[in-house]
């Protein structure tokens, strides 16, 4: 019985480590999807309390060796949504790469934009700059 438990535990552990691994092509898809996200949301949302796809993407990108570069590409991408740029700011803050000097240089175009945010099950609009300062001062995760 003990041997079966050990084999099952080792099998489960090896499958979990394979599941957690993503190659660079996977990160390209994650980056592309995150760049087109239409709302910004942190924490549990909706009736069943789910984490948003954007937040899951940030968590996945943080596992990458090139996380800083991915978040900077999103932040500097003129086709990326303002919501995705807030997720990029979250990732950069988590990595310790976001500071007051980045405010106007990276996010100048989005500064006065309205951003769709989802809190619980309420979708509303807020100014990019207000959300950005919240990220800068308090982080996201």
What are the residue ranges of the model-derived segments?
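Positively charged n-region of N-terminal signal peptides that target proteins for export
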Residues: 1-4
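Bacterial N-terminal signal peptides
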Residues: 7-14
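Amphipathic alpha-helical scaffolding segments comprising HEAT/armadillo-like alpha-solenoid repeats
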Residues: 23-40, 64-75, 98-112
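HEAT-repeat alpha-solenoid elements in large eukaryotic scaffold proteins
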Residues: 37-51
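Residue-level detector of extended alpha-helical repeat arrays and alpha-solenoid scaffolds
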Residues: 51-54, 84-85
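Alpha-helix N-cap/helix-start positions at coil->helix boundaries
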Residues: 80-82, 113-116
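Alpha-solenoid helical repeat scaffolds
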Residues: 87, 118-121, 131
């Amino acid at each position: 019985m003990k041997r079966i438990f050990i084999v099952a535990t080792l099998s489960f552990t090896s499958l979990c480590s394979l599941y957690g691994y993503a190659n660079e092509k996977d990160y390209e898809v994650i980056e592309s999807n995150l760049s087109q996200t239409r709302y910004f949301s942190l924490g549990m949302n909706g009736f069943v309390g789910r984490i948003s796809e954007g937040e899951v993407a940030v968590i996945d990108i943080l596992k990458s060796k090139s996380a800083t570069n991915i978040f900077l590409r999103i932040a500097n991408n003129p086709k990326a949504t303002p919501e995705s740029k807030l997720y990029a700011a979250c990732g950069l803050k988590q990595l310790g790469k976001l500071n007051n000097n980045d405010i106007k240089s990276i996010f100048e175009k989005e500064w006065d934009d309205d951003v769709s945010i989802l809190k619980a099950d309420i979708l509303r609009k807020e100014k990019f700059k207000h959300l950005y300062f919240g990220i800068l001062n308090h982080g996201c995760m």
